[in-house]
């Protein structure tokens, strides 16, 4: 038995990935996929530590609890499938080496599957994007209005998620740097990253940063609605984005932070950035999201081929 799995599972997983781990077709994983798998494994391992379980002892109840964690509740079907495939591959190896007696992921694997047809990602048209950018360039003087437009500018101008906006600190925003940027801190399986601010977002975020520093609010969150400095809820962020989109006449099905993130992604692709580059901007370790949005730039026939091929990324 390889005792390193019991004493240092992080190192054991890294060694196994580098030495022999491979996808279903027995092809070695790409360097990018190895990084993704290591981050996912570490995220799950930390979950087990909190529950008092180990790589050698966890069961289906621990996996079920993982889906109910704050991050897990927001996982898409595709992300859940990636995790189950990773755990199944891991447990089969641990059974083979004598570290485990069973594979609790095996029954989960038959229940999880790639979605047959994922909906086309929602985003603003170029005209709607331009209208929203123009809307952000004329901020009101009141604190609430300035804050709301700064929040919208952060989503549209950096592509961050709602969770990343909630967690952003005042010290993470550098609107006067050359070029201006936002530091997005590490969370879950995502590493820390630096995102350059789109030029249209700089004035409003600079104005909000200066105003926020003068407000008598507890804590150091960049965005908060309360004097005690609590993080903004998803519902409140959704309302703020929906209000701004209503102002420019947007009538799409999902006036949400995710739509603005998708718009940022599509704008970068239209500007000539590769899917690898844009995925890094978004903090993604897989190109799946970018590939789906890139498919919206293609002729219809080619788009269908790309969307149908997307699930193969799980074995990269």
Regions found by a protein language model. Give the residues of each.
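Catalytic-site neighborhood detector that most strongly recognizes the C-terminal catalytic loop/helix
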Residues: 282-316
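Conserved tyrosine-mediated DNA breakage-rejoining catalytic core shared by Y-recombinases
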Residues: 163, 167-203
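Basic, Lys/Arg- and aromatic-enriched nucleic-acid-binding interface segment
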Residues: 131-160
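N-terminal core-binding DNA-recognition domain of tyrosine recombinases/integrases
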Residues: 16-119
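Active-site/catalytic core of tyrosine-dependent DNA strand-transfer enzymes
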Residues: 198-252
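Alpha-helix N-cap/helix-start motif at helix boundaries, enriched for small hydrophobics
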Residues: 87, 151-152, 159, 163-168, ...
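DNA breakage-rejoining catalytic core of tyrosine-based enzymes
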Residues: 114-133, 190-199, 216-219
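Short, basic (Lys/Arg/His-rich) helix/loop patches that form interaction surfaces
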Residues: 141, 241-280, 299
